[in-house]
C-alpha cells in the first residue's frame, strides 16, 4: 500500500500544488491499487484508465502553470448513480447494464471543474435501495473491516462501495447519495466521515433518481476537513435542477476548527430506542461529554414524531421510486428482453432487469399510491413528514445542533439480515428524519465497539447551516482522536 494514499485529501492537494508529486503518478498508482483490491473488496463497477490519465495530465499542466482548483489532481471514486460521460453508469442494476451516458452529472462536473480526477465507479445497492450493499447486480461489497472471527461485514448501504474505497485508502474522497441514510450509515460502518447537506445544496441533475424529494448527493472523506473540501467542490446552484438552491455556498473549510464554545447541543430523548446496544449509548454519552468539555451547553429536547419517521419514509420513498422507475422499459437505453408483444417485452425487461428489493419497493409504492389507499398511506405519510420538520424547527429555536448516534449498531455480517426486510429497514432509524426534513447531517467516527469496529455519531443542524455542522463535527473528531484503521487484507 502506497504511503501517498494514506494521506488526507487536504494533505495530497498541498503536495500536488507544491509539485512534490504528480497527478499522473497518483492516478496510475490509484488505478493499480483499486484493481488489486477489487477481487477481495468487490467495491468497483467500472474503470476508464485513458480518461483517468488524461484528466490527471490536464491537472499536472494546470499545476505547472500555478493554476488549479480546490482539489486539483486528487483521484476520486464516484458512486455508480452519477453519470460520468462515456463511462458505464448502471446504478448497479441489470436494467441499465452497458448504459454509457453522453453527458456529465452536475455533481461530477463541479468536481472536475475544481480539479478532481475520475478514478473509478463504485458499487451500490441497486438504484440506491438497500442498507447493506447486497442488492447490487455485481454482488455484495466487503467492508474493509472484518468481524471478530474474521467474517465478512457489510460496509452499509446504499453507498457501500464509496465508503469501502475511502476506508481502504484507495482514493482521497468519494461521492454518495443519501435518501434515508445511504451516506451516513456506511460512513459509520467504515470509520469514515459522511455528509448530507441541506436538500438542494448539491444538484441531483444527472444522478439516477430513487426518491426525488429525499435524494441528497454528498461526499465521503477521511476527515471532517476533507469532507468540507469535497462538499465545497460539489455544491452550488444548478439551473438544470429545479430544486437546486440559489444561495451562495459558504466557506465550509473555514468552519472546520472554529470554536464550539457556547453552542447549544440538543439531545433528543426519542432516539434512545429499545434494544439499542449499550456500546452505542456509551458512544453517544462520550460525544455529549466531549462537547460539554469543549464549552457547549447540552440541552435535552423532544422530537415527538420521530417514532413515525421510519414508516412514513418507507411509504414516501417507495411511492416516489415507483414513479421514477417507470421510465425504465428497455426501449431507448439499457437492457431489453423481447416478448411476443409490446406488453410482454415491458414485463420481461422489467422482470429480468430489476432485482427483488427494487421490485418490492416498486410494488409497495404502487400500492400506497393506488386510488383506494392514497389517503390512508401516502397522504398521511406526507402529513407526518410535515410534523417531523416542525419538530426540528421548534427544537432549533432552543439549540444550534442535534447530536444522535448514526446507526443502531456497528457493521453486521453480510447475509445476516438479507432475508428480513424489516430488520434491514431498521438500520435507517436514526437517519431518515434528516432526509424527511431536508436538513444537513453528518456522521463522524467516534470510537470502536468491543470487537474493534467503528461507531459513528450524527450531527444535524438547521437548513443552510452546514457551517455549524462542520464545527461540531470537527470538535467530536478532535476529542475522539479516531485513528483506527482496518488491517489490510485486500492488497
Swiss-Prot record:
GO terms for molecular function: ATP binding; glutaminyl-tRNA synthase (glutamine-hydrolyzing) activity. GO terms for cellular component: glutamyl-tRNA(Gln) amidotransferase complex. Keywords: ATP-binding, Ligase, Nucleotide-binding, Protein biosynthesis. One of its GO terms (biological process) is translation. Pfam families: Amidase. Heterotrimer of A, B and C subunits. This is Glutamyl-tRNA(Gln) amidotransferase subunit A. It comes from Maricaulis maris (strain MCS10).
Amino acid at each position: 500500500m502506497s504511503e501517498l494514499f494514506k494521506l488526507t485529501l487536504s494533505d495530497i492537494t498541498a503536495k500536488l500544488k507544491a509539485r512534490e508529486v504528480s497527478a499522473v503518478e497518483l492516478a496510475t498508482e490509484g488505478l493499480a491499487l483499486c484493481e488489486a483490491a477489487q477481487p477481495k473488496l468487490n467495491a468497483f463497477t467500472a474503470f476508464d484508465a485513458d480518461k483517468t490519465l488524461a484528466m490527471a495530465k490536464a491537472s499536472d499542466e494546470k499545476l505547472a502553470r500555478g493554476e488549479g482548483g480546490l482539489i486539483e489532481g486528487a483521484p476520486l471514486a464516484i458512486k455508480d448513480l452519477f453519470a460520468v460521460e462515456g463511462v458505464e453508469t448502471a446504478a448497479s442494476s441489470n436494467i441499465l447494464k452497458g448504459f454509457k451516458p453522453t453527458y456529465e452529472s452536475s455533481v461530477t462536473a463541479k468536481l472536475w471543474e475544481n480539479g478532481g480526477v475520475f478514478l473509478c465507479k463504485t458499487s451500490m445497492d441497486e438504484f440506491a435501495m438497500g442498507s447493506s450493499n447486497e442488492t447490487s447486480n455485481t454482488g455484495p461489497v466487503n467492508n474493509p473491516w472484518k468481524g471478530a472471527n474474521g467474517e465478512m461485514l457489510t460496509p452499509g448501504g446504499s453507498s457501500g462501495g464509496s465508503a469501502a474505497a475511502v476506508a481502504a485508502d484507495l482514493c482521497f474522497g468519494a461521492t454518495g447519495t443519501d435518501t434515508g441514510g445511504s451516506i451516513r450509515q456506511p460512513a459509520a460502518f467504515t470509520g469514515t466521515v459522511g455528509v448530507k447537506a441541506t436538500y438542494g445544496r448539491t444538484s441531483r441533475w444527472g444522478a439516477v433518481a430513487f426518491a426525488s424529494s429525499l435524494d441528497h448527493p454528498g461526499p465521503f472523506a477521511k476527515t471532517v476537513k476533507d469532507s468540507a473540501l469535497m462538499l465545497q467542490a460539489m455544491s452550488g446552484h444548478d439551473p438544470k435542477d429545479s430544486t437546486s438552491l440559489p444561495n451562495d455556498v459558504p466557506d465550509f473549510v473555514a468552519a472546520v476548527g472554529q470554536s464550539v464554545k457556547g453552542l447549544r447541543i440538543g439531545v433528543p430523548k426519542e432516539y434512545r430506542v429499545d434494544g439499542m446496544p449499550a456500546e452505542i449509548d456509551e458512544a453517544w454519552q462520550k460525544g455529549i461529554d466531549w462537547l460539554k468539555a469543549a464549552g457547549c451547553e447540552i440541552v435535552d429536547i423532544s422530537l415527538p414524531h420521530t417514532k413515525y419517521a421510519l414508516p412514513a419514509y418507507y411509504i414516501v420513498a417507495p411511492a416516489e421510486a415507483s414513479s421514477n422507475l417507470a421510465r425504465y422499459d428497455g426501449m431507448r437505453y439499457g437492457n431489453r428482453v423481447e416478448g411476443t408483444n409490446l406488453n410482454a417485452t415491458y414485463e420481461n425487461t422489467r422482470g429480468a432487469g430489476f432485482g427483488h428489493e427494487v421490485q418490492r419497493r416498486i410494488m409497495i409504492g404502487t400500492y400506497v399510491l393506488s386510488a383506494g389507499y392514497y389517503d390512508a398511506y401516502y397522504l398521511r405519510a406526507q402529513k407526518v413528514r410535515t410534523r417531523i420538520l416542525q419538530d426540528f424547527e421548534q427544537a432549533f429555536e432552543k439549540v444550534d445542533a442535534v447530536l444522535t448516534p448514526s446507526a443502531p449498531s456497528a457493521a453486521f455480517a453480510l447475509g445476516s439480515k438479507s432475508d428480513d426486510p424489516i430488520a434491514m429497514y431498521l438500520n435507517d432509524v436514526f437517519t431518515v428524519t434528516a432526509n424527511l426534513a431536508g436538513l444537513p447531517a453528518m456522521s463522524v467516527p467516534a470510537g470502536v465497539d468491543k470487537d474493534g469496529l467503528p461507531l459513528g455519531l450524527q450531527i444535524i443542524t438547521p437548513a443552510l447551516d452546514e457551517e455549524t455542522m462542520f464545527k461540531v463535527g470537527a470538535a467530536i473528531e478532535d476529542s475522539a482522536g479516531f485513528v483506527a484503521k482496518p488491517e489490510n487484507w485486500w492488497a
